[in-house]
Amino acid sequence: MRKWALLFVVVAFCRLNSLAQSPFGHYFQDTLKPGYRISGKLDSVDVNLAAYQHTLPGFFNPFLFSFSYSDLNTTWHKPQQRRYSAIPHIAFEYSMGSKLAQFGKITYTQAIDSNTFIQFDYIRNTTNGNLRNSNFERNSVQLSLMHRSRYYGTILDVSFYGNNNQLNDGLTGDSVREGFPLNFQEVVKSNAGNKTKEFHADWKNYISFTKDSLHKAGVMLQSRLDIKNQRYFERDTLKQIYGFYNYDSTYSYDYWELASLRLNGGMFYKNQDFNFEAGLGTRYWDYDNMVLHQDTTEAYGYAALDMILKGFSLKAAANYTFVGANGEMSVVADLGKRFRSNLFTAHASFSRQYPENYQRNYYANTLNYSWINRQLSTKTLGNVHWSSKNRVIPFFAEAFIESNTNMPVFIQNRWRQDTLMHLSVAGIQVGFEYSYRKLLIQSRVSYRESSGNLLPNWLLSGRIAYNGGLFKAQKLKTVTGIEIGYISSYRLMDFAPMINTYVFSNSGRAFREMMKLHFYSQFDLGYFRWFIRIENIEQTFVKPTNFEGLGYPVTPLQFRFGVSWDFFN
């Protein structure tokens, strides 16, 4: 009976943004193992430091295997995973290339003493010229501090994220002009853009009633501040373009901001292989949008579990709101098991949430809508992953499925829940790696099915490279080769810049299937690495008339160069 009661508590109440994370116990094992590098494995440095550049605005990338329908809307900051190191570690990585593309990252990890740990991350990503006058600048700063003593522990997380996008409607014509560079072709609305900013401050405090380091029980207090805002600006003959305006005929400067404060209080229990938290919390939020202003107070229960049992690692959390946004809930669970050279992981989640404030009520220069009724939208997600690092042919296999009901979609200049009632996506991916002497072969195959056919069904890629040392001493290591890929066709989506979201289009136009060809060469000299990458070589041999989205052509030939350096004291 007690086991079922505990399961009910875990599944019924939680409002934590992360799973149970007590500052006491085994969380301080080193995560920066010998051989750790900020740029990852040597054979994929070019991928880690130079994400594929495409012309689509926002974060939607149909060429990546993982996908969620929430990627079509404004995408918010994803915090970095916690790291622990017994010795100070500082690292940076930087890459640059065509279209003024630049990516930089600096990390700092240190155990100040046996009870105090600090982590800092700064990430910057910019580009200019995927289309004329189109660029973005993204900055992310995150600071984490963790401290413990015999009776007290604390976790402090502070982060800021800013995203500044210059936007346009892409090419004015329906086809790309042959014989002209992409960045010299005309565009519409080159003087429009949006800005999103976030600030988060999360402070958890644990007061233990026991001095036994292996068994901790006591009170947990948490306060969290979240601020998000989005702005859109555009200067043009707006009445002629949109047919109406709300406050200015030539200049739009729309904005909304959502600020919220959470206060949680509860109990926790921690031993060597078990960590549990549960309690009650309240949230006050304030929504400000031009002439609109709304605020309310919510109350909820929360719980989180983290345990290890017979080699299985289980992390679970859940929530239920009973005052304010009554009926909102979320259940999430992660299960992992390592067996010799194999690692099995599974993730499942279910949530019921009301649409975002800006989706329900919004006033802008060229938009104006307000919902009378709202419905809870549901999202069900599951994925499994199996990886094997055997000595013969290392491989991995993964699959995922996502189902959404009553998800808000942007149709005819407003968000609606009564049109596309069900949206789902499912995919499976397998890959392997084979090494023979100094020959390295890597390959992966992905297949996906999505509502509306907005994703390519097939994604195929293969890399063949020389993997070995150079010169007599063999201290300079290199992985140099080519990457060949294939992308099947998919339905092109439209983009609404004034609300920063993608729109299902009835144009009937589609991305035409195509082959991909890239060259890469990366080098390792101890803690210092560098790489060069030439991607989209195939575009020099085909007519530039293919599109990734309505008005957004396929990216042409790109050159990339980057370095990384790790410092261990």
Regions found by a protein language model. Name each.
Residues 95-97, 101, 125-144, 188-197, ...:
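Outer-membrane beta-barrel proteins
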Residues 132, 154-206, 228-238, 256, ...:
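Flexible loop and strand-edge segments within Gram-negative outer membrane beta-barrel domains
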Residues 22-28, 60, 197-234, 252-569:
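Exposed, low-structure sequence patches enriched in small/polar residues
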Residues 61-66, 76-108, 129:
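Short strand-turn segments of transmembrane beta-barrel domains in outer membranes
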Residues 102-124, 133-165, 201, 205:
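Transmembrane beta-barrel wall of Gram-negative outer-membrane proteins
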Residues 4-13:
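Sec-dependent N-terminal signal peptides
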Residues 20-75:
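N-terminal periplasmic/intermembrane-space "pro-region" immediately following the signal or transit peptide
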